[in-house]
């Protein structure tokens, strides 16, 4: 409990930001779902066959896993709030639509006949007594939708829409139960609060209910005003990073350097996703900059993959020229350290089976179980390369990056992929096996951005190239350890390092 409170106090500012994002997304989704579902239900009430079809279709959408729905929208809408909002609205429509139709159909037919006898139009009947009588049932559907929205909105973090899910995702990545609890408990409390508020509104008069939702819409609009005004004052760059502490540290370094040396501001989007996710987001303009590694560019982004040597300078030149020609992306100068892929095993396993090189795994491939990330498992410079170059046919379970270290620590797996600067190698006493057949190319990190952005702001090259040739492997490993193991803020670690190196004044 003490650790939970300390973590909450340390990250209170981040929590307020995440809570605000979650509230904005949830409230906007709920209001849009109400505006779509209730008028549709009023229309479908008099078209029973069509109503059955629409309800079935809406119900089918609810059976689609939310993560799959988000993934389907990314190619069409990019990343960020729009695909998250669209997916959440689709999920929220069904309970509101169903309850509104049920509520309207449950009205005593004699009241309908009396209204017609008094010469009331359909709209007058709806306004005078049908909606008021059906309102308790309608509000019940709205409450169900609200709870559903708030819970599902935690997944919006995976596509860059922010929210309380960022704490959960970060907690999983850092193996930090306090962060997970902060995100989960906040989401649960928010759902309970929404449910209570809507329950109170349910008992109010119709005009009071409408006024309540109008007030919500007004407050929602006002909450977006500061961000819109800030964007007009200064150009804001979106700097994203892959999952893990290292990309977040590098992204914060870029942000700090840009804000000190230019008139622009920058927002960091950490734990944004895998390589392909960030690459597509960059090309579509959903993000502006992210740190990418030379070997990843040559092996995964360039199509077809060029044949390169294992000389770092040559790999960088091929990556820089190839990505510029293929996608009109600018790849600035790399840092010094190599963060290559690696295959690691616990030291006691290495000693027990005499494992020193990746080739040595051949003699134990039937005895040991491997845990790889989805990305490593599908890459030519990953498990596919282990199969083709080393002839390995390992028993592989795929999992999220942070979970593989927990799995190897608990003994569920004995082999894992890693990055050579991962703090977990030291934390869990792992031994990196020698890449004796040189499967993994050099991996040096450098900022990747659109050529159009660099042409518009040429000062970015000068500012970000101050990191070129800087940061050794031991320094990067230590920075990762501070964030991943000691739990320090990536922004603070990045700031302290830049100040120590004389790259940042304040």
From Swiss-Prot:
Its main location: membrane. It holds the Pfam family OpuAC. One of its GO terms (biological process) is amino acid transport. The chain crosses the membrane at residues 23-43, 49-69, 70-90, 148-168, 178-198, 209-229. GO terms for molecular function: ABC-type quaternary ammonium compound transporting activity. Disulfide bonds: none annotated. Changing residue 375 to Q: Disrupts ergothioneine (EGT) binding. Binds EGT 500-fold more weakly. Residues 19-198 form the ABC transmembrane type-1 domain. The keyword Manganese does not apply. Residues 231-506 are annotated as: Ergothioneine binding domain. Disruption phenotype: Lacks detectable ergothioneine. Cellular levels of glutathione (GSH) and cysteine are unaffected. In the N-terminal section; belongs to the binding-protein-dependent transport system permease family. PANTHER family: GLYCINE BETAINE/L-PROLINE TRANSPORT SYSTEM PERMEASE PROTEIN PROW, OSMOPROTECTANT IMPORT PERMEASE PROTEIN OSMW. The complex is probably composed of at least an ATP-binding protein (EgtUA) and a transmembrane protein (EgtUBC). Probably undergoes significant conformational change when bound to ergothioneine. Part of an ABC transporter complex EgtU required for the uptake of ergothioneine (EGT), a natural low-molecular weight (LMW) thiol antioxidant. Responsible for the translocation of the substrate across the membrane. Also contains a C-terminal periplasmic solute-binding domain (SBD) which binds to EGT with sub-micromolar affinity. Binds L-hercynine about 10,000-fold less tightly than EGT. Cannot bind the structurally similar compounds L-histidine, proline-betaine, choline, ectoine, carnitine or dimethylpropiothetin. In EgtUBC the transmembrane domain (TMD) and the solute-binding domain (SBD) are fused. This is Ergothioneine transporter EgtUBC. The lineage of its organism: Bacteria, Bacillati, Bacillota, Bacilli, Lactobacillales. The gene is egtUBC.
């Amino acid at each position: 409990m003490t650790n939970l409170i300390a973590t909450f106090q340390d990250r209170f500012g981040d929590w307020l930001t995440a809570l605000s994002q979650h509230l904005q997304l949830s409230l906007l989704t709920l209001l849009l779902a109400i505006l779509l579902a209730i008028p549709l239900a009023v229309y479908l009430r008099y078209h029973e066959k069509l109503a059955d079809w629409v309800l079935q279709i809406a119900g089918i959408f609810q059976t689609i896993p939310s993560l799959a729905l988000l993934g389907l929208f990314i190619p069409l809408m990019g990343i960020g709030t729009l695909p998250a909002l669209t997916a959440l609205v689709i999920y929220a429509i069904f309970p509101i639509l169903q309850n509104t139709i049920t509520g309207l159909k449950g009205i005593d037919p004699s009241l309908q006949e009396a209204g017609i006898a008094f010469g009331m139009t359909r709209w007058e009947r709806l306004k005078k007594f049908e909606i008021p009588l059906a309102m308790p049932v309608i509000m019940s559907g709205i409450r169900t939708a609200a709870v559903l929205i708030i819970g599902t909105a935690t997944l919006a973090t995976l596509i860059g829409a922010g929210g309380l899910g960022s704490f959960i995702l970060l907690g999983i990545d850092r193996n930090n139960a306090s962060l997970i609890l902060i995100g989960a408990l906040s989401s649960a409390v928010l759902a309970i609060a929404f449910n209570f508020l809507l329950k109170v509104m349910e008992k109010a008069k119709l005009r009071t209910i409408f006024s309540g939702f109008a007030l919500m819409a007004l407050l929602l609009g006002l909450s977006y005003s500061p961000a819109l005004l800030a964007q007009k004052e200064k150009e804001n760059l979106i700097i994203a990073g892959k999952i893990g502490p290292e990309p977040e540290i590098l992204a914060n370094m870029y942000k700090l350097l840009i804000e000190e040396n230019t008139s622009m501001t920058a927002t960091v989007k950490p734990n944004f996703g895998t390589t392909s996710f960030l690459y597509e987001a960059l090309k579509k303009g959903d993000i502006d900059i992210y740190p990418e590694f030379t070997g990843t560019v040559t092996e995964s982004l360039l199509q077809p993959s060029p044949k390169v040597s294992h000389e770092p300078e040559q790999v960088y030149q091929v990556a820089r020229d190839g990505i510029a020609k293929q996608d009109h992306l600018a790849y600035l100068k790399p840092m010094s350290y190599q963060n290559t892929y690696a295959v690691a095993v616990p030291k006691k396993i290495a000693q027990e089976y005499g494992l020193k090189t990746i080739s040595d795994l051949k003699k134990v491939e039937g005895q040991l179980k491997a845990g790889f990330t989805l990305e490593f498992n599908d890459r030519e410079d990953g498990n596919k390369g282990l199969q083709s170059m080393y002839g390995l046919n390992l028993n592989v379970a795929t999992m999220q990056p942070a979970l593989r270290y927990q799995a190897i620590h608990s003994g569920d797996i004995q082999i894992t992929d890693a990055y050579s600067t991962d703090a977990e190698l030291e934390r869990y006493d792992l031994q990196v096996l020698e890449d004796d057949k040189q499967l993994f190319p050099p991996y040096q990190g450098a900022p990747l951005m659109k050529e159009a952005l660099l042409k518009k702001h040429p000062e970015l090259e000068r500012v970000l190239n101050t990191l070129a040739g800087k940061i050794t492997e031991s320094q990067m490993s230590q920075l990762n350890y501070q964030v991943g193991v000691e739990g320090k803020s990536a922004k603070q670690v990045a700031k302290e390092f830049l100040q120590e190196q004389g790259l940042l004044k304040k």
